[in-house]
UniProtKB/Swiss-Prot annotation:
GO MF annotations, alphabetized: mRNA binding; structural constituent of ribosome
Keyword Ribonucleoprotein: yes
Organism: Arabidopsis thaliana (Mouse-ear cress)
A GO CC annotation given for this chain: cytosolic ribosome
Keywords, in A-Z order: Ribonucleoprotein, Ribosomal protein
Protein name: Large ribosomal subunit protein eL30y
UniProt keyword Protein transport, yes or no: no
Pfam families named in the record: Ribosomal_L7Ae (PF01248)
Length: 112
């Protein structure tokens, strides 16, 4: 029960930092634009939802490894990630290009 509280609190922390990135930073949403930002080495952090297809996930992780960018597996499905971004559509993956006023890159180093 204690671990459930901790994960919920960290989940809320990620959501609030993500909302701040959406307001003050630069980001790209979607698979193709995430790969473009990784190939151009513009992305600083990649977030992937839990129900992103395995082939896409492994390809994003591979490009992120080549670009030395952190990858965070978001603890929710693509509907949850879209809602956390303040969008009314599903988001399977997103790349943070410029965090703006948020400290999301320091707080989430990535799962590498």
């Amino acid at each position: 029960m204690v671990t459930e509280k901790k994960t919920k609190k960290s989940h809320e922390g990620i959501n609030s930092r993500l909302a701040l990135v959406m307001k003050s930073g630069k980001y790209t949403l979607g698979y193709k634009s995430v790969l473009k930002s990784l190939r151009g080495s513009k992305g600083k952090l990649i977030l992937i939802s839990t129900n992103c297809p395995p082939l896409r996930r492994s390809e994003i992780e591979y490009y992120a490894m080549l670009a030395k960018v952190g990858v965070h597996h978001y603890n929710g499905n693509n509907v949850d990630l879209g809602t956390a971004c303040g969008k009314y559509f599903r988001v399977s993956c997103l790349s943070i290009v410029d965090p703006g006023d948020s400290d999301i890159i320091k707080s989430i180093p990535g799962d590498q």
